[in-house]
Regions:
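N-terminal pre-catalytic "stem/leader" segment of glycosyltransferase-like enzymes
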Residues: 1-5, 149-153, 177, 301, ...
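Active-site proximal beta-strand in glycosyltransferases
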Residues: 2-16, 32-35, 57, 79
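Catalytic binding pocket for nucleotide-activated donors in carbohydrate/polymer assembly enzymes
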Residues: 26-30, 38, 42-50, 55, ...
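A polyampholytic, Gly/Pro-enriched intrinsically disordered region
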Residues: 30-40, 73-81
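Glycine-rich, charge-decorated loop segments at or immediately adjacent to ligand/cofactor-binding or catalytic sites
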Residues: 17-29
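Short, conserved loop/helix-junction motifs that constitute active-site signature segments
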Residues: 2-4, 25-28, 71-73, 171-172
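A short, gly/pro- and small-residue-rich
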Residues: 2-14, 49, 93-107, 166, ...
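Nucleotide-sugar donor-binding catalytic core of glycosyltransferases
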Residues: 47-51, 56-225, 248-249
């Protein structure tokens, strides 16, 4: 409709990677497409699209400031709000041959230990995906025919699942940890036996209270997000919460590590930093306030909309 009547159409992605089946219609001259992750912007720019732009996300600081926090209900040492990303990878691997299983296991191991870099899209090649499809086909004519993109996503979500489960399990044995998410499987409940499962929270009213009342807010970034600052990280700091996030290049670019937020580069690093900052209340509060000040200075919706309208 916008293309037909030459009406400007603006879109701003808040997910990375963007859930796009194809780039069809993206090059319409009416479109102005903004990506919050620089890596995604560069991907589509390199495809020849000239109507794509880079624009980090933002926070409604004024709204968050006016929310009354129930510290008694939401207060805790460490909290995590988010999905655990149960992946299809184990099911997909159950029908692979031994070489394919070993190849995937190696990728998972390397990506688990790699922070600030993403190898999955490079090593899950079309050739490898085709070999998996042939393997499935040899077992059944009705077998699923997984695409390279689907297989890469399965690996990325599995690595994210392993990281989040490991982080929560270890921290839960050392500190008070609250998990706000949807359902847990029976296996997950056993692994996270020392973690308090609190169910989901409302984004607008409850989640900000969790961030403000928690001493430490975890933000293990989805592995497939190659560079962007996730909205969750900005939400945490916009509430005056203390952010402990996995290393993300754009977070390190826009925020000063250990002054406005804290970034970790391994599970061991995350555990050590959680221990340290729980034992140092004043330093933790200083970092939280500095993070909030940075949000108020450069991550307001008013500023982002002005940039968007300039285009």
């Amino acid at each position: 409709m916008c293309h037909k009547h030459d009406i400007k159409y603006v879109s701003w992605f808040f997910d990375s990677p963007p859930n796009l089946v194809s780039a069809k219609c993206m090059d319409y001259p009416c479109n102005r497409i903004f990506f919050f992750a620089r890596a995604d912007y560069e991907t589509y720019r390199n495809m020849g699209l000239e109507n794509v732009y880079y624009l980090p996300l933002a926070v409604n600081v004024d709204r968050l400031r006016n929310i009354t926090v129930d510290d008694q209900k939401y207060g805790c040492e460490i909290s995590f709000v988010g999905k655990l990303y149960e992946s299809m990878l184990p099911a997909l691997m159950s029908h692979m041959d031994e070489y394919q299983k070993g190849y995937i296991d190696s990728i998972v191991k390397v990506q688990m230990e790699l922070y600030g870099g993403y190898i999955i899209d490079d090593v899950i090649t079309e050739e490898f995906a085709e070999s998996v499809r042939k393997r499935y086909k040899s077992l059944s004519d009705k077998a699923i025919q997984v695409s390279r993109k689907e297989l890469a996503w399965a690996v990325a979500s599995h690595v994210t699942h392993l990281e989040r489960m490991s982080l929560l399990s270890i921290l839960g044995k050392r500190h008070q940890v609250k998990l706000y998410t949807f359902e847990l499987s029976e296996d997950e409940k056993k692994i996270l036996g020392n973690v308090e499962f609190c169910g989901p929270v409302d984004y607008l009213k409850e989640m900000p209270q969790v961030f403000a009342a928690s001493k430490i807010n975890l933000c293990p970034v989805l592995k497939a997000n190659r560079s962007g600052i996730p909205l969750r990280a900005l939400d945490i700091m916009g509430c005056g919460g203390f952010l402990l996030s996995s290393y993300q290049s754009e977070l390190a670019e826009y925020f000063i590590d250990r002054q406005e937020c804290v970034l970790y580069e391994s599970l061991e690093d995350a555990i050590a930093k959680a221990d340290f900052y729980l034992a140092n209340d004043e330093l933790r509060k200083e970092i939280s306030q500095a993070g909030l000040a940075r949000i108020e200075e450069a991550f307001r919706y008013e500023d982002r909309i002005k940039e968007l309208l300039k285009v």
